[in-house]
Amino acid sequence: DNGSSPTGNSDVYRGIAAFSEPETQAIAFLIDQYPFSLALNYHTYGNYLIHPWNHIDEPCPDDESFKNIGRTYAQQNKFAIGTAQETVGYKTNGGSDDWIYAHDAGQKVYSMTPELGLQEDGFWPAKSRIRDLAKTTLKGNQLWSKMAHRYFELSILDPLYLIKSTDNQIDILIN
């Protein structure tokens, strides 16, 4: 019961069994049907960006990639990046990030959870706070959508290389 509860009126209710709730069934269907590369699962609160593994105390195989992608997302909002243990201070079970990342749907999906807002916002922020909270993730969401199709890092080590990019192609000319 780390980070979740079997009690229906709890803020961290997980359902009676894996995929027992219609929302989780819908997400599982989408992950199985479409070739996602990135996923964001919004929660409140803490101004964190949480990535797998969250159910155990060890880094996932792509821990460094998650941290690099997370730093890109958090450039504007300065969210703290890490696992649930590293950010909120406890492990969580039954989380969507761990399942989406580990699920073999034909490709790896980097799934992360932005936790929006401050402690005083709580799990259910006031309606008057929604717009400001949404603004904290706007730039990150825009960057995230750009990364969803093509994500790579390129360093020019030699000025003799000329790089030209179009939507579907990168040309490198060596002088």
What kind of feature is each model-predicted range?
Residues 1-60, 103, 113-125:
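Active-site/substrate-binding loop(s) of hydrolase catalytic cores
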Residues 54-118:
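Catalytic cores of processing enzymes, dominated by hydrolases/peptidases
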Residues 36, 82, 147-150:
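Intrinsically disordered or highly flexible coil/loop and linker segments, enriched in small
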Residues 156-160:
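Surface-exposed, proline-enriched loop/turn segments that connect beta strands in immunoglobulin-like
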Residues 123-155:
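His/Asp/Glu-rich mid-to-C-terminal helical/loop segments that flank catalytic regions of hydrolases
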